[in-house]
């Protein structure tokens, strides 16, 4: 089927089934063919605003003006709003819409006042974007109070503050937020308003209609396939998506989100010389039972989420629904995550024998490439995937965290990442890595890659087994050059014949001791800090490091790059790196190939990367009696709950010290760690006096520990302890000294006060009140560590092993700073 030049409308999804096989859809020679899932809108300028009238029933959420995506009206225009805390009750006595920890947030009143003035219908049009470490939830607004309390229409996947003490937010789609060039707003009556960009004449405006462009619908379980179909020379543009009434969240990498083009049971499908652009979700997804797929020389850009998705996140066994043998070659995948920021350039789930070759993937808010989909060591059919000669760059932009240019999960024997150029990666709070072996990554080879200008390590392994990192160049990472997070009882990785050059930050992280368990092989590497400045090796001298068995054949020397200040990492012929067996490679071949015009498209200038923008939580102010938390749920804003059995820490509806609900902890002899069950809060108190209070009741035999920490590492420890008290065998003690009797089966009231920051004296005051008794005061009790300066962590820990229960109620954490 040959298309003449022109624009063709896709008003509804085109479905191709097995009987539609054996067809090529192509543009005529030299013809510009656009297949659009959108509709053009005509309007006019008035008083500096472009306006148009649309059918009020058409509630679109994307707009493209003169070929560029316009920004839906939002606040703030740059950066984020910080959530100020976790309310326990909806505003104005409204009915709950779910767990308070997933439906209520507080913001500064200045941002909430405009929302509180909206009608109920207008409020539900507002999207509240809540950012977590590696994804974002898109909530609809139910209620807003002038004091800053927000209530959402329903709960989504994750509790607020569950991954970090801060909660980045944006408010989107209300008239008062329309205040910057390039923004637009669609009113309930269909009035569309757009503020032109500087110097812009509005001539071409499109909004989306079709939710998907094409679906290839085979049935691999029945051996029925859509096959031998080619799309060549076609431009697919404009795809719709609408936020559900209850909001939307799709997890890490937006894994469950649909694509504009989707395929199940597809064989021998080719997309060549095509454009896939202006989507609200993912571009293309070869999901279940697909193989022998080719995407070649396609321009995939301006995406709501991901570019290419391969395989299925739920099909973890080999069989008819397993996807394999997908080739993505000489393809540009750029500017994604515009609606769902966790979208990835190219995502391989449970798939095998797939190749990404000579691609340019850049300008995403999360990882460029992700391979594997199991957290741990459970075998899956993910194997023998290859990423080679790809340019992976401009990632993160300080929006999300815990990402890499290439991110891997789980066992995947035969997977190789080679010859790639990874650079310009900046995260929101942590984890802007280059090469990232996350949970359970096993059997992966990384070789001949150039990694530079990342916010965190050029290489990071969370935990994994038997990975090989060889013959790579790591240059000028910002915080840590090479990071290892979690030691285990087998060889984690071999790190050899690599060049590591830096000018700032540490050479090795996460904590120094992780490098001295004998479970990493490190040898024949070259290290250099610019200017010959001294540096340590995980807290050790060069001799101490080598005496442990590391780097016995390695060198400290200038590698003699040709011009690293200009981005030229070619080695000079006399480079000492050759003496360690390093094999020079041509990093310049990474990226797309062919004519200069094609390479020029890939070379888009995205501007300087945003680094080091560390979100800082406002000081925590908590008063939680658990009355707003559902029975059986975890405490809101709490971290570190017992993952294997969340019921070990849960809210119950009986026996409370005050009100009807309290928090129950259940200890026992068979828990994984001695400190379980436990939970903690992240207060972010840096100065002044912190006050913590709680009621506690313990069964006989329950051991209970309350501790404050500064999370700044020491040489031999990952944190610094301050106030620490223990309830054990009917007594309250601190620092090994008994302070008072603490009888079981009654509610005890505890208060802890301490100065932190500049005015600290490394002591705390403690008050214990028994039922019907007078408060017992204990003053100037010493901190467990004199090095504690700030309060990052307040924990409730169960170090015992007896089968017993403990209850907590009315937890208060607050801080005052003298003016």
Where are these regions (language model features)?
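Secretory/extracellular carbohydrate-interaction modules
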Residues: 656-729
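Solvent-exposed strand-to-loop "edge" motifs in beta-rich extracellular domains
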Residues: 236, 527, 628, 685-687, ...
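Extracellular polysaccharide-degrading/modifying enzymes targeting complex plant/algal/animal polysaccharides
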Residues: 1-275, 316-320, 550-557, 566-617
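Glycine- and acidic/polar-rich repeat regions and solenoidal domains
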Residues: 13, 241-263, 277, 281-287, ...
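Carbohydrate-binding surfaces in secreted/extracellular proteins
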Residues: 626, 694, 744, 749-781
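Flexible glycan-contacting loops in extracellular carbohydrate-active proteins
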Residues: 776-807
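Extracellular glycan-recognition surfaces and repeat-rich motifs
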Residues: 630-664
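Short, aromatic/His-centered strand-loop micro-motif at the edge of beta-sheets
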Residues: 731-751
């Amino acid at each position: 089927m040959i298309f003449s030049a022109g624009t063709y409308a896709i008003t509804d999804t085109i479905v191709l089934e097995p009987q539609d096989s054996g067809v090529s859809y192509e543009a005529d020679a030299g013809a510009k063919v656009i297949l659009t899932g959108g509709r053009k809108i005509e309007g006019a300028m008035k008083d500096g605003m472009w306006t148009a009238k649309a059918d009020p029933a058409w509630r679109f959420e994307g707009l493209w003006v003169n070929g560029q995506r316009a920004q839906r009206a939002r606040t703030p225009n740059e950066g984020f709003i910080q959530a100020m805390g976790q309310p326990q009750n909806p505003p104005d006595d409204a009915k709950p819409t779910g767990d308070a920890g997933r439906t209520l947030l507080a913001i500064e009143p200045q941002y909430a006042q405009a929302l509180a003035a909206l009608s109920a219908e207008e409020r539900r049009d507002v999207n509240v974007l809540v950012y977590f470490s590696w994804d974002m939830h898109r909530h609809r607004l139910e209620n807003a109070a002038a004091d800053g309390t927000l209530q959402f229409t329903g709960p989504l996947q994750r509790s607020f503050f569950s991954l970090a003490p801060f909660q980045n937010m944006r408010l989107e789609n209300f008239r008062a937020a329309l205040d910057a060039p390039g923004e637009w707003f669609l009113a309930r009556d269909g009035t569309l308003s757009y503020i032109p960009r500087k110097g812009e004449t509005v001539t071409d405006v499109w909004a989306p209609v079709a939710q998907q462009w094409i679906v290839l619908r085979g049935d691999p379980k029945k051996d029925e396939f859509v096959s031998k179909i080619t799309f060549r020379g076609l431009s697919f543009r404009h795809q719709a998506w609408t936020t559900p009434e209850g909001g939307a969240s799709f997890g890490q990498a937006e894994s469950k989100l649909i694509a504009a083009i989707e395929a199940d049971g597809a064989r021998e499908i080719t997309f060549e010389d095509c454009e896939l652009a202006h989507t609200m979700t993912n571009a293309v997804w070869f999901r279940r039972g697909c193989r022998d797929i080719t995407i070649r020389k396609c321009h995939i850009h301006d995406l709501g989420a991901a570019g290419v998705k391969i395989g299925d996140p739920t099909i973890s066994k080999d069989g008819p629904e397993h996807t394999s043998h997908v080739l993505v070659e000489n393809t540009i995948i750029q500017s994604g995550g515009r609606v769902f920021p966790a979208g990835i350039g190219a995502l391989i789930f449970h798939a095998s024998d797939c190749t990404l070759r000579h691609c340019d993937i850049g300008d995403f808010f999360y990882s460029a490439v992700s391979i594997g989909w199991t957290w741990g060591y459970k075998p899956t059919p993910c194997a023998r995937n290859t990423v080679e000669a790809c340019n992976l760059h401009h990632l993160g932009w300080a929006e999300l965290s815990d990402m890499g240019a290439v991110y891997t999960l789980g066992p995947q024997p035969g997977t190789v990442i080679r010859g790639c150029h990874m650079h310009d990666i900046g995260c929101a709070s942590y984890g802007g890595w280059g090469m990232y072996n996350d949970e359970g990554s096993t059997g992966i080879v990384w070789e001949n890659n150039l990694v530079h200008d990342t916010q965190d390590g050029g290489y990071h392994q969370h935990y994994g087994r038997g990975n090989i990192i060889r013959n790579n160049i790591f240059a000028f990472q910002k915080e840590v050059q090479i990071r290892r997070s979690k030691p285990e009882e087998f060889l984690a990785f071999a790190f050899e014949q690599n060049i590591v050059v830096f000018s700032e930050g540490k050479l090795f992280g996460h904590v120094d001791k992780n490098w001295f368990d004998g479970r990493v092989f490190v040898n024949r590497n070259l290290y250099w800090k610019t200017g010959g400045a001294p540096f340590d090796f995980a807290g050790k001298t060069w001799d101490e490091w080598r005496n442990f068995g590391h780097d016995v054949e390695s060198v400290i020397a200038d590698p003699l790059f040709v011009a690293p200040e200009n981005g030229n990492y070619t080695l000079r012929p006399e480079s000492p790196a050759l003496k360690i067996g390093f094999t020079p490679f041509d990093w310049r071949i990474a990226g797309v190939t062919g004519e200069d015009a094609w390479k020029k498209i890939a070379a888009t200038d995205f501007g300087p990367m945003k680094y080091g923008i560390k979100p800082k939580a406002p000081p925590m102010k908590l008063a939680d009696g658990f009355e707003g938390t559902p029975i059986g749920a975890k405490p809101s804003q709490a971290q570190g709950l017992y993952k294997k059995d969340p019921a070990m820490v849960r809210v119950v509806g009986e026996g409370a010290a005050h009100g009807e609900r309290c928090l129950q902890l259940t200890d026992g002899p068979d828990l994984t760690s001695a400190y379980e069950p436990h939970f903690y809060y992240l207060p972010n108190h840096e100065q002044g006096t912190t006050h913590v209070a709680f009621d506690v009741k313990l069964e006989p035999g329950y051991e209970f520990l309350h501790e404050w920490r500064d999370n700044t590492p020491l040489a031999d420890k990952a944190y610094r302890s301050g106030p620490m008290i223990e309830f054990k065998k009917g007594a309250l003690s601190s620092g090994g000294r008994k302070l008072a009797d603490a009888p079981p089966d009654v509610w005890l009231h505890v208060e802890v006060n301490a100065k932190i920051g500049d005015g600290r004296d490394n002591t705390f005051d403690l008050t214990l009140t028994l039922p019907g008794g007078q408060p017992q005061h204990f003053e100037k009790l010493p901190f467990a560590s004199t090095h504690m300066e700030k309060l990052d962590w307040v924990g409730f820990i169960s170090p015992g092993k007896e089968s017993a229960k403990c209850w907590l109620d009315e937890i208060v954490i607050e801080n005052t700073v003298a003016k």
